[in-house]
Amino acid sequence: MGFSSTVGSVLILTTLLICSVYLYSSVDVVSSKFTNAYSQHAESLQGKMNENLELVEITKLGDDIVLKLSNNGTETLSCEHWTVMYNGTPKAYIANQSYVAPMDTVQISINGSTPCRISLISEYGNKYYYKL
């Protein structure tokens, strides 16, 4: 009777040890992913707060509408990550440079006619609306 209870308790303790090692490794991986996602979210919110685009000028050149925007924020922005919507539909655009440094300007031209509503969604999700 004494031998079988000893073997049973050793077997249960070994099983608990193996399960706890597996559980610890799973929790460690999830915790690492959670921490990484949280830091990315914090960086995104910081970028959103530090971003500020201002419309300087709108001109109509033939079939194109040219927007001149000034980056008055503290973030360097990538024009490739922007979305331009023309009357509520996404529209292809051409920017005269790939990146806009703080206190720099960029020109965006889209094919369209006036009157219209143009919405610019930046890489951090800020929305800027313009009505022509």
From Swiss-Prot:
Q: Which residues carry this modification: N-acetylcysteine?
A: C19
Protein localization: Archaeal flagellum
Swiss-Prot/TrEMBL keywords:
Acetylation, Archaeal flagellum, Lipoprotein, Signal
The signal peptide here is 1-18
| GO CC, alphabetical | archaeal-type flagellum
Lipid modification (S-archaeol cysteine), residues: C19
Task: Give the similarity note.
Answer: To M.jannaschii FlaF.
From the Swiss-Prot or TrEMBL record, give the protein name.
Putative flagella-related protein F
Lineage, opening ranks = Archaea, Methanobacteriati, Methanobacteriota, Methanomada group, Methanococci
